């Protein structure tokens, strides 16, 4: 028995455990059901979270993918089995619950095991699928280049600004746009976790835009695998999901040639993913605009010092040697700061020690000759991509700009007139319409970085390398572009072998030609443009030379010393459209022009002709005549001008000839009534003899004009920004004329040395008629009877404030010169000016002026942007009511104060003008406070004497530190008292 005891004990133990387990399972039936339901829900969710992105990722790892597929299959089976058992337990009786409970526990164990394996899969896939935040992009850095560093800083500022969701980086080919954004990308990588983006994606787009290829680059950074058979739409959805998971992303699209629809690529809109940004680089500003960028950063060429350093880096130490350095610097400068050109030329000259070789290269570059093949391949071919992108019309317009010398600022109107003469501008009805179309083309070429702003207003120029490229196109072409360009090269003579029958354009302008050769008649049979202007030594143009160009459309002899022009009947220039003889100051007479049947433009500005050109009245297509600055023009025969039926522009600005009304003029001379007969006239600039014209309100033909400049009285010109329709009255008693009818059409009025202004103003006020078109008013050399003003002020101000007439409701500019006002308020109150639109005030040599606004005047001038005051000895302040609670000029951008010895203050202590950008204070020694604080973030330049700057007192001590970098000291010279200028002119 004793030996059986252990066996019996074990049997009883097993029976107890089995029974206990059954009882326990029966008791825990409900809890087991609940636990299985919860685990089953987690497993189902886990299986669903094994996203398509994870599956496609694992195609790179076949064994791992097989394990995942097996897990998913097992999970599916267990989930199905568990759901089936859970359904069965509903109909399970109490007696069967222990068995059912045991089965549920078994399935629960399987579910938990699969759940554990699934979690391990997810963790492993999360590690595998997490892309590097920023990948290094190989390339040189620009961090040590001044200009590039500034542009990089602008982009970085944009990345931190909530207003800049999309940033455009644009510039000409080879200027370094890609290098700039590569540097940005790599700087972000160096910053690691401190940079703000969860993911930075650098994508190369290129000219041949392939949406699929761009999507593939983005998908690769997101570790999304792409399938050949997968549609762009489906891939876009997966990219969208991937990017939306990122906290913030930065997408850099490099080399964009056409606008891209980011939605079609799957890029979330920036408002959907706050803080995310898109940067794109393009050669074309228009692409940036089309893609609705919020900030556009133009990449400019390198500064000279940075360009030299880059050249040295590529050319080697030889360029620093004494015998090469000077000529090497000149070669570097010929590259115009364009990095691509600097690298190409520098590399080609690397290690070259022979000075003659360097001189040869410099000579070739200065003549726009590609002296090595790599210049064509590495510089011109990339630029040709931009050129090929242009429409044919724009290509011709671009090439024509290369006819001008290197670094030449081209007048936009001049080049557009060339385009019009060549037939590049469509016939849009009027010359002004065609001119506007041409200006639009100029702007588009600027947006393509093929033209840039010139040194003067309304001019453009070509970058040296771009011009070399254009000349390369023209010289190597044998089609309609084939041209000879030798402008600005110091040429002293032109040989016949330089010319060829295939040439379409010939530019010999700005040289030292003294004579021109006789050529074979009709030798250059295709040449339509011949530019000879700027040859100051040229005294004669032989008939034999011009006869070689029978198809000329444009002939420019401006700035030469020719005394006469060959007989037009002998020249047979039957296709000539435009003849430019501007500033031929020796030219006193022209032959009859009646045989130039297609002539539309004649420019005689600055010539010494004595009489009106003959034969123009026979030309049915003639549209533009420039007789400005013809200081010796004395005669215009009657009934000639009225026959110029197609004339659209008559410019006689500063001409000696003065027009008179019928009955006043000398017998046989033209009268102003003839001008009224010109139904197509749109632009007119003339000088009228005296006031009778102003008395004739029947001259309503004035309202047909789109532009006019009428000078009544003595010759007087003062340019403003609103000269579109300008009336100048000089040395007349204006109380004897009625100008109200003319002011209705006028945008700018100038009164110089006029009497009776008080009476004229009184009449205008009493007529209760404002002039809404007038935007600029100039009053100069006028003594005003202030007693009369008081009377007129009381007349106007006696009305209810709402009834007070604002005589000039849209006035934007006001110029006062040598006017004896004590305050600007006198003029403002007298005319009832509310000054709501005034942008510019310019006051000079008003010796009695003590303040702008007096104590009675508490108004602000809300839109005033510029104040310029000089030589006003009595001026003490700008506003007498210095305790006014807000700046009276809240939007002032430019403040220029010169030679104001008694000026003490311009603002309250501590007052800040937040919009100030430019300040100039010269010889204002008592002024010791500026309305500037450390919050003035728009300041660009402050100009003044160093001694004055050091005496300034600052309410905000940190303001000095903030604006000190923008201070430009001027040379201190004694105050000049302009006695001569105080005399009435």
UniProtKB/Swiss-Prot annotation:
Gene3D superfamilies: Helical domain of apoptotic protease-activating factors, P-loop containing nucleotide triphosphate hydrolases, Ribonuclease Inhibitor, Winged helix-like DNA-binding domain superfamily/Winged helix DNA-binding domain
Domain of life: Eukaryota
Keyword GTP-binding (UniProt): no
PROSITE patterns: LRR
Keyword Signal: no
Binding-site list for ATP: 171-178
GO BP field: defense response
GO molecular function, one term: ADP binding
Alphabetized UniProt keyword annotations: ATP-binding, Coiled coil, Leucine-rich repeat, Nucleotide-binding, Plant defense, Repeat
LRR repeats: from-to residues: 502-523, 526-547, 551-572, 575-597, 598-620, 621-643
Domain NB-ARC: 167-429
UniProt feature coiled coil, ranges: 24-88
Function: Disease resistance protein.
Record note on domains: The LRR repeats probably act as specificity determinant of pathogen recognition.
Family: Belongs to the disease resistance NB-LRR family.
Protein's recorded name: Disease resistance protein At4g27190
Species of origin: Arabidopsis thaliana
Phylogenetic placement of the source organism: Eukaryota, Viridiplantae, Streptophyta, Embryophyta, Tracheophyta
């Amino acid at each position: 028995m004793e030996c059986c005891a252990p066996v019996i004990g074990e049997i009883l133990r097993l029976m107890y455990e089995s029974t206990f387990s059954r009882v326990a399972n029966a008791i825990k039936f409900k809890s087991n059901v609940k636990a299985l339901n919860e685990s089953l829900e987690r497993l189902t969710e886990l299986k669903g979270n094994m996203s398509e992105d994870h599956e496609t990722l694992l195609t790179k790892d076949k064994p791992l993918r097989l394990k995942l597929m097996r897990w998913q299959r097992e999970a599916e089976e267990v989930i199905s089995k568990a759901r089936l058992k859970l359904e069965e337990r509903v109909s399970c009786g109490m007696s069967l619950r222990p068995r059912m409970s045991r089965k549920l526990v078994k399935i629960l164990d399987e579910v938990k095991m699969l759940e554990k394996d699934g979690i391990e899969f997810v963790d492993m896939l999360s590690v595998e699928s997490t892309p590097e935040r920023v990948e290094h992009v190989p390339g040189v850095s620009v961090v040590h280049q001044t200009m590039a560093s500034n542009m990089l800083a602008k982009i970085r500022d944009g990345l931190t600004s909530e207003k800049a969701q999309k940033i455009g980086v644009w510039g000409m080919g080879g200027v370094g746009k890609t290098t700039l954004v590569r540097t940005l990308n790599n700087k972000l990588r160096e910053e690691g976790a401190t940079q703000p983006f969860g993911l930075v994606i650098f994508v190369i787009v290129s000219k041949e835009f392939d949406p699929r290829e761009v999507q593939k680059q983005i998908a690769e950074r997101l570790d999304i695998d792409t399938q050949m058979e997968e549609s762009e739409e489906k891939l876009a959805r997966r990219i969208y999901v991937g990017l939306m998971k990122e906290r913030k992303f930065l997408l850099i699209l490099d080399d964009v040639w056409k606008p891209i629809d980011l939605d079609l690529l799957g890029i979330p809109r920036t408002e959907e993913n706050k803080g995310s940004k898109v940067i794109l680089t393009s050669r074309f500003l228009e692409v940036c605009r089309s893609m609705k960028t919020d900030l556009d950063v133009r990449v400019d060429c390198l500064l000279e010092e940075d360009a030299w350093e880059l050249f040295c880096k590529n050319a080697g130490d030889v360029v620093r040697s004494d015998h090469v350095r000077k000529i090497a610097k000149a070669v570097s400068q010929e590259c115009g700061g364009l990095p691509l050109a600097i690298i190409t030329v520098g590399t080609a000259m690397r290690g070259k020690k022979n000075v003659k070789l360097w001189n040869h290269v410099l000579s070739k570059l200065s003549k726009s000759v590609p002296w090595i093949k790599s210049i064509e391949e590495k510089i011109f071919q990339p630029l040709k991509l931009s050129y090929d992108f242009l429409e044919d019309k724009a290509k011709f317009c671009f090439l024509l700009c290369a006819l001008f010398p290197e670094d030449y600022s081209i007048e936009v109107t001049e080049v557009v007139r060339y385009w019009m003469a060549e037939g590049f501008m469509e016939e849009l009805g009027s010359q002004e319409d065609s001119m506007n179309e041409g200006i639009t083309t100029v702007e588009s070429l600027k947006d393509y970085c093929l033209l840039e702003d010139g040194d003067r207003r309304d001019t453009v120029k070509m970058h040296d390398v771009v011009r070399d490229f254009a000349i390369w196109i023209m010289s190597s072409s044998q089609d309609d572009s084939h041209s000879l360009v030798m402008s600005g090269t110091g040429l002293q003579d032109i040989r016949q072998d330089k010319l060829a029958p295939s040439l379409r354009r010939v530019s010999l302008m700005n040289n030292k030609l003294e004579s021109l050769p006789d050529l074979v008649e009709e030798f250059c049979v295709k040449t339509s443009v011949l530019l000879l202007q700027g040859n100051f030594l040229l005294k004669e143009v032989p008939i034999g030379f011009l006869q070689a160009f029978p198809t000329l459309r444009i002939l420019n002899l401006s700035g030469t010393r020719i005394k006469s022009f060959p007989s037009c009947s002998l020249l047979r220039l039957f296709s000539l459209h435009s003849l430019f003889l501007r500033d031929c100051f020796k030219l006193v007479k022209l032959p009859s022009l009646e045989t130039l049947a297609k002539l539309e433009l004649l420019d005689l500005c600055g010539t010494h002709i004595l009489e009106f050109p003959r034969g123009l009245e026979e030309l049915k297509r003639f549209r533009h005549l420039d007789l400005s600055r013809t200081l010796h023009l004395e005669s215009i025969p009657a009934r000639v001008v009225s026959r110029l039926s197609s004339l659209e522009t008559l410019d006689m600005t500063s001409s000696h000839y003065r027009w008179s009304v019928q009955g006043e003029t000398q017998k046989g001379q033209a009268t102003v009534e003839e001008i009224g007969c010109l139904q197509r006239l749109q632009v007119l600039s003339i000088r009228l003899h005296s006031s009778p014209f102003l008395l004739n309100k029947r001259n309503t033909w004035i309202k047909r004009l789109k532009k006019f400049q009428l000078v009544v009285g003595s010759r007087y010109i003062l340019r403003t920004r609103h000269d579109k329709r300008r009336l100048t009255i000089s040395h007349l008693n204006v109380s004897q004329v009625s100008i109200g009818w003319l002011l209705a059409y006028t945008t700018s009025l100038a009164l110089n040395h006029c009497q009776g202004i008080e009476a004229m103003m009184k009449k205008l006020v009493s007529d209760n008629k404002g002039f809404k078109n007038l935007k600029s008013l100039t009053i100069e050399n006028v003594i005003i009877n202030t007693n009369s003003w008081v009377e007129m002020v009381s007349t106007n101000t006696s009305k209810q404030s709402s009834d007070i007439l604002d005589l000039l409701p849209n006035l934007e500019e006001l110029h006062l010169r040598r006017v004896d006002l004590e305050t600007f308020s006198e003029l403002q109150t007298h005319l009832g000016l509310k000054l709501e639109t005034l942008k510019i005030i310019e006051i000079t040599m008003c010796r009695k002026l003590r303040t702008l606004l007096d104590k009675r005047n508490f108004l602000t001038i809300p839109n005033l942007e510029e104040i310029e005051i000089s030589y006003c000895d009595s001026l003490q302040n700008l506003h007498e009511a210095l305790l006014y609670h807000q700046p009276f000029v809240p939007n002032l951008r430019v403040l220029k104060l010169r030679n104001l010895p008694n000026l003490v203050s311009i603002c309250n202590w501590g007052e800040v003008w937040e919009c100030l950008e430019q300040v100039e204070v010269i010889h204002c020694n008592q002024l010791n406070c500026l309305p500037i604080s450390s919050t003035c973030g728009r300041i660009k330049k402050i100009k003044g004497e160093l001694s004055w700057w050091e005496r300034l007192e600052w309410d905000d001590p940190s303001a000095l530190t903030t604006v000190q970098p923008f201070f430009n000291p001027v040379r201190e010279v004694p105050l000049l008292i302009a006695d001569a200028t105080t005399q009435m002119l």
